[in-house]
Amino acid sequence: MKYMVSFDQERMLKPAVIGGIINGILGAICCLCYVIGGAVAAHLYVNAGGICDYENCGLVGAISGVIGGVIASILSFLFMSAYLSALGLKAAMFTGASFIIGFITAIIFGAILGAVGGVIYVVIKNR
């Protein structure tokens, strides 16, 4: 059975443009995803009955940034390993060192930027 894919301009163009704009903005602004993740974590914390102050929301944001950093570094390592294997390169020494450096960097920046997101959430909520 053959399926035909057709470009329905009326239905596909607007979502594709909006998605492209979002991808462009998030890709252009370094680490914005960590800040947004921290703000979302703070929002969920406050909705669960937590206290909406700088310390608690910043801590929840920092924890979410650490978790995000761990996940991002593991996925990045797996994708990079598969990419290097597909190219036929053997970079065993490079991938181990780059994983450790990337892992530590992602955790540090994730914690900092996640905390910033949690604090930004408090500022916006208390306006």
Curated annotation (Swiss-Prot):
Localization of this protein: Cell membrane
GO CC terms of this entry: plasma membrane
Membrane topology field: Multi-pass membrane protein
Protein name: Uncharacterized protein MJ1491
Main location: membrane
Transmembrane segments: 16-36, 59-79, 100-120
Alphabetical keyword list: Cell membrane, Membrane, Transmembrane, Transmembrane helix
Domain of life: Archaea
